[in-house]
A protein has these predicted regions:
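Short beta-strand scaffold segments in enzyme catalytic cores
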Residues: 3-7, 40, 143-145, 164-166
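Beta-strand scaffold of nucleotide-dependent catalytic cores
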Residues: 5, 16-18
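Basic phosphate/pyrophosphate-binding loop/patch that engages nucleotide-derived ligands
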Residues: 7-13, 100
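Short, ordered coil/turn segments that flank beta-strands lining enzyme active or ligand-binding pockets
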Residues: 10-11, 45, 148
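A short, polar/charged loop-to-alpha-helix boundary motif
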Residues: 20-34, 160-179
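Cysteine/selenocysteine-centered motifs that mediate thiol-based redox chemistry or coordinate metal-sulfur cofactors
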Residues: 38-72, 173-216
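CN hydrolase (nitrilase-like) catalytic-core segments centered on the catalytic cysteine
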Residues: 48, 54-164
Length: 216
């Protein structure tokens, strides 16, 4: 509802959430922006997990913020985009972004992407007779695993609904970091300085005689 990813642990407990920082394109008709308070990495039984939603996986600063907190497993979720320009390969674009983050951070990325099912098209058909023409196209969705070398692990799903399985070994993040660790020896923090505002944004504050109601 709020353009938000939930982090759920292996006990079924919600341990965190991340609201998309900037709604993309038509999303602006429904949602507003998130804030830096949810740019967090969570310790889980399988390793440190961070997440970003859809197009914000292109945001280099947001991605680095997660990497700097020790992220080793990145969750990236996307929507299928059948309304993209005809020459735009959405599946490839998703894979490129996931591979870039995995290669830069020397970590694993798990990608999940929605698909346009026949049920969705059937639900729209009465009001949108040309729904097949509008929503049927190849290479609109990619779901799969990307390793720390930027290579795909296992068999991804392209334009299909299903579950992708792959085995990941966090020790495989070590050797690549020995070559290029942008969080340590392979960076210059005497030159670069990233500041991140993690304060929750308050959309509105009610006051009466200059007294903050929220402090009562």
């Amino acid at each position: 509802i709020y353009n938000t990813n939930l982090i759920i642990d292996n006990q079924g407990k919600v341990i965190g959430k991340h609201r998309k920082l900037v709604p993309t394109w038509a999303e602006k008709l429904t949602w507003t922006s998130g804030d830096g308070s949810s740019l967090k990495v969570y310790d889980t039984a399988v390793g440190p997990i961070g997440t970003l939603a859809c197009g914000e996986n292109t945001n280099t600063l947001a991605r680095f913020t997660l990497l700097a907190q020790g992220e080793l497993i990145h969750i990236a979720n996307y929507i299928s985009l059948p309304v993209a320009p005809p020459d735009y390969n959405m599946a490839e674009a998703i894979k490129i972004r996931a591979a870039a983050h995995s290669f830069e951070g020397k970590l694993f990325t798990i990608v999940s992407c929605s698909t346009i099912s026949e049920e969705i098209k059937d639900a729209l058909r009465e009001d949108v007779p040309n729904v097949d023409e509008l929503l049927t196209r190849k290479n609109s969705a990619f779901s799969g695993f990307i390793g720390p070398t930027g290579a795909v692990i296992g068999e991804p799903l392209i334009d299909e609904e299903g579950i992708v399985y792959a085995e990941i070994d966090l020790e495989k993040c070590i050797q690549p970091k020995q070559m290029h660790d942008i969080l340590g020896h392979y960076n210059r923090f005497d030159i670069f300085d990233l500041r991140v505002n993690i304060a929750p944004t308050r959309k509105i504050t009610f006051v009466d005689n200059h007294e903050d109601f929220n402090k009562r």
